[in-house]
A protein has these predicted regions:
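RNA pseudouridine synthases
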Residues: 1-175
Length: 175
């Protein structure tokens, strides 16, 4: 989360967010732990090779969910993201994600739709929804780990990162 101290700074930051392709843009990166899908890996054999997903999402406010729908569906919005597989275990993968659009539950919906549901996501992954008991408090293994933008007054590049924490991320932690 970024807070502005003045109206001018808020306007500058809003402009950077709106201008995703310009210089000084706000860049927010995510990482997720996803369940491995053999079909997806045949297409992206090279680790850290970015792939782009483009889908059309429709939001259901009643159920607080979003769905992939055909292009041209009334109320659907084009949704794009880029992802790269960074590391793998036998059944999980660590994925780096860059949103090119910002839609409701976009990462969760698009990765699940591509056959790579986020570990612990009971809303968009049937397998996670069926596992209860000791994992009831498990949350989706999704983390906004990096935020970059230009300082509104000085123009200096500001970069902030965090190390993802939680059960699924621990499987990829280097000792």
């Amino acid at each position: 989360i970024v807070f502005a101290k003045t109206k001018q700074a808020a306007a500058n930051l809003s402009s950077q967010i709106a201008d995703r392709k310009g210089s000084g843009q706000v860049v927010k990166r995510y990482c997720a732990v996803v369940r491995r899908n053999a079909d997806v890996y045949k297409e992206t054999e090279t680790a850290a090779e970015y792939q782009e997903l483009t889908d059309y999402l429709q939001r259901d406010r009643r159920t607080n969910t979003s769905y992939i729908v055909p292009k041209g569906t009334k109320g659907a919005k084009e949704s794009k993201l880029r992802y790269a597989i960074l590391e793998e275990t036998e059944d999980l993968s660590l994925v780096d994600i860059e949103l090119l659009t910002g839609r409701h539950h976009q990462i969760r919906v698009q990765l699940s739709g591509a056959g790579m549901p986020i570990a612990g996501d009971k809303k968009y992954d049937e397998k996670s929804a069926k596992t209860t008991g000791t994992r009831e408090k498990e949350t989706p293994a999704l983390c906004a780990y990096s935020l970059s933008f230009q300082h509104p007054k000085t123009g200096k590049q500001m970069d902030f990162t965090v190390l993802p924490e939680g059960g699924a991320f621990e499987k990829f932690r280097k000792e």
